[in-house]
Amino acid sequence: MSTHANHPFHLVDYSPWPLTGAIGAMTTVTGLVQWFHQYDNTLFLLGNIITMLTMYQWWRDISREGTFQGLHTIPVTLGLRWGMILFIISEVFFFISFFWAFFHSSLSPTIELGMVWPPIGIEPFNPFQIPLLNTAILLASGVTVTWAHHSLMENNHTQTIQSLFFTVLLGIYFSILQAYEYIEAPFTIADNVYGSTFFVATGFHGLHVLIGTSFLLICLFRHMNCHFSSSHHFGFEAAAWYWHFVDVVWLFLYISIYWWGN
C-alpha cells in the first residue's frame, strides 16, 4: 500500500522526540521536587539536558521538513498559524489568572495585611527606575523585531540580521536587569501575598522573555543559513507574534503591579 496521498497535508513520520520530551519533562519536574526538599540537583540537571537535546533535534527535523523537503504547504502553514494563535490566547488567560490574584488582593486587602496596599512592611520598587528602563527596552525590541519583519519581506538580508541581532541583545539585557532587580529586591516570594503575586507574575513573564529570546536567536541562525524567504517565513512570524505578546504583557505588569500597585 502506498504511503503517498493526493492531498496538501503533511503526515508526519514516526518520531522518538515526543517520548524523549515526555521523559525529559518528567525527569525535570521530579528532580525539581527533589531539589526543593534539599536533595541533590543532579536529576533536575539531567532532565534539563534531555529536554534541551530533544528540543534541538525535534526543531531540527521540523526545520528540515519545512525548509528543504517542502512539506509545509499553504494549508499546513495555515494550520500552524492557527495553532500559534490559539497558543498565545491560552497564554493570555494564563497571565489573566495572575492579574486576577493581584487585583483581588490589592483592591480588597485583608485584616492580616493591615487593610492597606502595599501591605505593611513591604517596600515596593520605584517604578521610574529599573522597571521603566525595562519597559523602554522591551518597547525598543518591539520596534527592532518589526524592522526585522519588514526587512525580511523586502528581501534585505543584511538588515534582517542586524535587526534580529539587536532584538536578541535587548532581550538578554532585559533578563539581566530583571535578575539584578530580583537580587536587590527588599522582599521575597515568601513575604505575604504581595511578594507571591509579584514574583510569580514577573517571574513567569521573565521566563517567557527567555523563551522568546531563544526563539528569535534560532530565527537569527536560520536566517543566516538562508532558511527564510519573503514569502515563506512562518517560523519568524511566530517568534515575532510571541515577542509582541511578551511586550504587551509587560506593559500591563508595569502599569498594574509596578506603578498602580505601588
UniProtKB/Swiss-Prot annotation:
BP GO terms, sorted: mitochondrial electron transport, cytochrome c to oxygen
GO cellular component, one term: mitochondrial inner membrane
Keywords of the record: Membrane, Mitochondrion, Mitochondrion inner membrane, Translocase, Transmembrane, Transmembrane helix
Cellular localization per UniProt: Mitochondrion inner membrane
Annotated transmembrane regions: 16-36, 42-59, 83-103, 128-148, 163-183, 198-218, 240-260
A Pfam match: COX3
Catalysed transformations (reactions): 4 Fe(II)-[cytochrome c] + O2 + 8 H(+)(in) = 4 Fe(III)-[cytochrome c] + 2 H2O + 4 H(+)(out)
InterPro entries: Cyt_c/ubiquinol_Oxase_su3, Cyt_c_oxase_su3_dom, Cyt_c_oxidase-like_su3, Cyt_c_oxidase_su3-like_sf, Cyt_c_oxidase_su3_a-hlx
Membrane topology recorded in Swiss-Prot or TrEMBL: Multi-pass membrane protein
Enzyme class: translocase
Nucleotidyltransferase as UniProt keyword: no
Gene3D superfamilies recorded: 1.10.287.70, Cytochrome c oxidase, subunit III, four-helix bundle
Main location: mitochondrion
GO molecular function term, any single one: cytochrome-c oxidase activity
Function: Component of the cytochrome c oxidase, the last enzyme in the mitochondrial electron transport chain which drives oxidative phosphorylation. The respiratory chain contains 3 multisubunit complexes succinate dehydrogenase (complex II, CII), ubiquinol-cytochrome c oxidoreductase (cytochrome b-c1 complex, complex III, CIII) and cytochrome c oxidase (complex IV, CIV), that cooperate to transfer electrons derived from NADH and succinate to molecular oxygen, creating an electrochemical gradient over the inner membrane that drives transmembrane transport and the ATP synthase.
Quaternary context: Component of the cytochrome c oxidase (complex IV, CIV), a multisubunit enzyme composed of a catalytic core of 3 subunits and several supernumerary subunits. The complex exists as a monomer or a dimer and forms supercomplexes (SCs) in the inner mitochondrial membrane with ubiquinol-cytochrome c oxidoreductase (cytochrome b-c1 complex, complex III, CIII).
Protein name: Cytochrome c oxidase subunit 3
Organism: Aedes aegypti
Source taxonomy: Eukaryota, Metazoa, Ecdysozoa, Arthropoda, Hexapoda
